[in-house]
Amino acid sequence: MNKFKRSSRRRLPPIRSGEIIDYKNTSLLRRFISEQGKILSRRMNKLTSKQQRLVTVAIKRARILALLPFLNNES
């Protein structure tokens, strides 16, 4: 017997097919940043490796242009 059950329900992808991963799209990029301001891992995001690379580059560009903070000090 297998202890772990897989759900038959298919999860929605975190990035829909129409969404473009761009450094100007800060509302999309904020979903992939932790409360401390760190970039979340691929396992937590459920992204493909290509999507994770694009998200990482976009977040880093947005940080340099001051669209996203490097650290989240709102505590």
From Swiss-Prot:
Q: What keywords sit in the KW lines?
A: Chloroplast, Plastid, Ribonucleoprotein, Ribosomal protein, RNA-binding, rRNA-binding
What InterPro entries does UniProt report for this protein, alphabetically?
Ribosomal_bS18, Ribosomal_bS18_CS, Ribosomal_bS18_sf
Location of the protein in the cell: Plastid, Chloroplast
Q: Key word S-adenosyl-L-methionine present in the record?
A: no
Q: Which GO terms describe its cellular component?
A: chloroplast; mitochondrial small ribosomal subunit
Would I find Lipoprotein among this entry's keywords? no
Task: Write out the GO biological process terms.
Answer: translation
Q: Name one GO molecular function term.
A: structural constituent of ribosome
UniProt record similarity statement: Belongs to the bacterial ribosomal protein bS18 family.
Q: How does it assemble?
A: Part of the 30S ribosomal subunit.
Q: Under which name does UniProt file this protein? A: Small ribosomal subunit protein bS18c
What gene does this protein come from? rps18
